[in-house]
């Protein structure tokens, strides 16, 4: 049991964002619409899927030094997992913001008291995180396009009962597609290919033994992370006041990131209200039309 906890703690240091359960039900006095994402394809770890994942890595787009670091993890990989393919209706602008400002997502979790996890940006494409339970890690984005992100992660787990920290490295390949609205019910479809290596042979052995359990947890948490993006997109559409209050209370997030957050929220809200009004026959909505549902009773 202790080995299981240690191994899971090490993995959580790499991907702490995936361990948080998001289950908001009300943002203010208005009931939130149901938050839902669709699992389009289950997670998999087969050799065939792994070979496809390896072939899909954008290694030719990396500088020599970065490519070597990635290939070291791949060569010594202990575990592979393709997380579920998930479809969601979230606004792409919201998804785009959080994938480029992960510390803002952590800031929201802290305000909502979901977690006290800390994530700080240390360079333009690098972050360090601390879960506060002995787990800590770093994330570096090596390659980024509108539809792909390749990340190199390092993490460790420290405990008074262990003679030395247990460490791990991972390569994560986030793949995102934006389906044609005429052909899909989803605005976003994404998945992650995950390659993990443990320097310790003992930890690797334990990790392989508990892989069915850890795979299930990783799949579940990726779905819940997707639900968080869906939740925030829904909140921006329907509860702009609540979103503004959350942004004002966030810590560990730069002023310009907060301003961008609010701009994204305002853009999403206005577009949503205009669409709603157009469906009700109002083609040229005024500012008063847009904010009417959020004003108090006239005196």
Name what the model sees in each region.
Residues 1-7:
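N-terminal secretory signal peptides that target proteins for export/translocation
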Residues 9-21:
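Bacterial N-terminal signal peptides
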Residues 23-29:
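Sec/Tat signal peptide C-region and signal peptidase I cleavage site
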Residues 29-123:
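Hydrophobic ligand-binding cavity/cleft-lining segments
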Residues 30-62, 175-299:
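Terminal "cap-and-tail" regions of soluble proteins that handle hydrophobic small molecules
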Residues 79-84, 91-94, 147-149, 168-170, ...:
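Envelope-exposed proteins and targeting segments
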Residues 104-105, 156-160, 196-200:
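Solvent-exposed loop/turn segments at secondary-structure junctions
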Residues 119-174:
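Glycine-rich portal/gate segments that line the openings of hydrophobic small-molecule binding cavities
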